[in-house]
Amino acid sequence: MSPIWSNWPGEQVCAPSAIVRPTSEAELADVIAQAAKRGERVRAVGSGHSFTDIACTDGVMIDMTGLQRVLDVDQPTGLVTVEGGAKLRALGPQLAQRRLGLENQGDVDPQSITGATATATHGTGVRFQNLSARIVSLRLVTAGGEVLSLSEGDDYLAARVSLGALGVISQVTLQTVPLFTLHRHDQRRSLAQTLERLDEFVDGNDHFEFFVFPYADKALTRTMHRSDEQPKPTPGWQRMVGENFENGGLSLICQTGRRFPSVAPRLNRLMTNMMSSSTVQDRAYKVFATQRKVRFTEMEYAIPRENGREALQRVIDLVRRRSLPIMFPIEVRFSAPDDSFLSTAYGRDTCYIAVHQYAGMEFESYFRAVEEIMDDYAGRPHWGKRHYQTAATLRERYPQWDRFAAVRDRLDPDRVFLNDYTRRVLGP
């Protein structure tokens, strides 16, 4: 009987022929080579934190949780080598012990390092690139069990954001930075003021993002500044109370909205009124990531920064015009361009607009309508979140698409690492 695997929200389910948990690079290479000889396909999985079926397979699934060690730390240069299954949540404190930290992070941290980088996971901050751009070298196990060390050239630029389509990354060497403190201030503002002053907020802060419930006229802005000051940690009990209140309040409101969709506008305004100002000063890895306990599904698009304000307003107008029962806020973030071939921020200053829906509520009509808006801006969907694009629609949005395809054809000509998702978004 085949094992059953599901992703973290339980929305993607598959039955691999086997789930294998290697604990060394040599074992990983052998598992891949043997599967390829049998004619089986292979996919690697870390935390299963993607909303798409990117990890699913009916072939051999490689569980990367046996490869989580920190292998080398060069404190003077900040170069840190970790195994491909290392979890961001564990890496933060491990680096902090050595007075180092990741330059930037997303707003959740259960992902594995290679799962996060393979999908171009990002944080916010217009002067900072996504996480994959911090990879200075990597080791890639190909379909034949060969281990490639990559630090330059097309293979390297393709492998940093690869969707797992080139092989399995056994190790990455990251460029880290000296340990720093992050000062975060959350403040409720009018949506009109937030949009009017958007460039000021984005350019005037190290990191800036904001959240808006589509039926409300307020936004929650989050500004963050870096420093070498000592942290002033929030007491554990106070942090726990705040997280439980925030997650519990959102959960209760979402459950009410799922049962009575027509009251979504009033619930949006209620949730907005519950948002309050707060300040945190702590080590960056404790501040970047927040606890998300309410189940949801998500789609996120990367568009040129200059189109962000207009695109957001169109999404809000869409929700209001169609009276859609949306219970989660829209999240807006920003990042610097980078040069990974399939990075969603390739070659342009980027605004990310993420839309969500509470688990168990209809989302497809909302997501498809938002996607149509993002198409007008050559939007690039987050590789690990829901979308409806195909290779045919995506190709023109990535200037280096053909260079990635050439690397894929050379490294995996027999498509050992193919699954339904990569077939759809990259082609057969």
Curated annotation (Swiss-Prot):
Cited PROSITE patterns: FAD_PCMH (PS51387), OX2_COVAL_FAD (PS00862)
- What's one Pfam family the UniProt record gives for this protein? ALO
Q: Which InterPro entries does its entry note?
A: ALO_C (IPR007173), FAD-bd_PCMH (IPR016166), FAD-bd_PCMH-like_sf (IPR036318), FAD-bd_PCMH_sub1 (IPR016167), FAD-bd_PCMH_sub2 (IPR016169), FAD_lactone_oxidase-like (IPR010031), Oxid_FAD_bind_N (IPR006094), Oxy_OxRdtase_FAD_BS (IPR006093)
Q: Does the keyword Ligase apply?
A: no
- Spell out the temperature dependence recorded for this entry: Optimum temperature is 39 degrees Celsius. Is relatively thermostable since preincubation at 60 degrees Celsius for 5 minutes results in only partial inactivation of the enzyme (53% of control).
Per the record, pH dependence is:
Optimum pH is 8.0.
FAD-binding PCMH-type domain: from which residue to which, for each copy?
12-179
Q: Does the keyword Oxidoreductase apply?
A: yes
Name of the featured protein: L-gulono-1,4-lactone dehydrogenase
The lineage, from the top, is: Bacteria, Bacillati, Actinomycetota, Actinomycetes, Mycobacteriales
